């Protein structure tokens, strides 16, 4: 009986075909032409042009692992989510909207985690960043005060001070949006907020920033602080970006 329950539970966490198709459409599986030796474990193949290809099973496994870490934080507001890259700002704000984490879109102000005189000073229990290169300042400060760090990592990422790496294409809007959507969905599933057997009614399109929508740094938070009606209008106006080709 226990073996059957274990087998059933493991099937629930398996990567579904529908999610694989979404990842392929969003080019989540494509890295860059350079590679860090510690990222080789996540590589499936290499294209003729030199682009490394991620193993999607390993990508999914790290998404589930990261989600299980995120749900251990009793107060989600103590999770800091940082993204300096404009293409990722809508994604992290939507992620924080549904998981109640704290977003730091735009330039990360030095001293947010280490300088008590900083008006934005905070002491998060966990850090989630979009890019270990662009968001290096946040990672360094987290290492100074022993904050565990989860990061989306491309094939050339430096994993210094990164505790959990989610291998993926973290440079294009569709891939970034999809990863945060998958992560938010898994967090809500683990918390029991949504069913694992039913489709989440929030579409991944809502996490994707289109080029003409990328705001100025100081306007980013207000720009993306929209309600459900505006979300529906955005989705209807742009169709389903993750339709199969």
From Swiss-Prot:
Q: Which source organism does the UniProt entry give?
A: Giardia intestinalis (strain ATCC 50803 / WB clone C6) (Giardia lamblia)
Q: Which GO terms describe its biological process?
A: ribosomal small subunit assembly; translation
Q: NCBIfam families, from UniProt?
A: uS2_euk_arch
| Protein name (Swiss-Prot/TrEMBL) | Small ribosomal subunit protein uS2
Q: List the SUPFAM superfamilies hit by this protein, alphabetically.
A: Ribosomal protein S2 (SSF52313)
Which compartments is it annotated to reside in? Cytoplasm
Oligomeric and partner information: Component of the small ribosomal subunit. Mature ribosomes consist of a small (40S) and a large (60S) subunit. The 40S subunit contains about 33 different proteins and 1 molecule of RNA (18S). The 60S subunit contains about 49 different proteins and 3 molecules of RNA (25S, 5.8S and 5S). Interacts with ribosomal protein S21.
Q: Which InterPro entries match?
A: Ribosomal_uS2, Ribosomal_uS2_CS, Ribosomal_uS2_euk, Ribosomal_uS2_euk/arc, Ribosomal_uS2_flav_dom_sf
Q: Which family does it belong to?
A: Belongs to the universal ribosomal protein uS2 family.
A Pfam family annotated for this chain is Ribosomal_S2
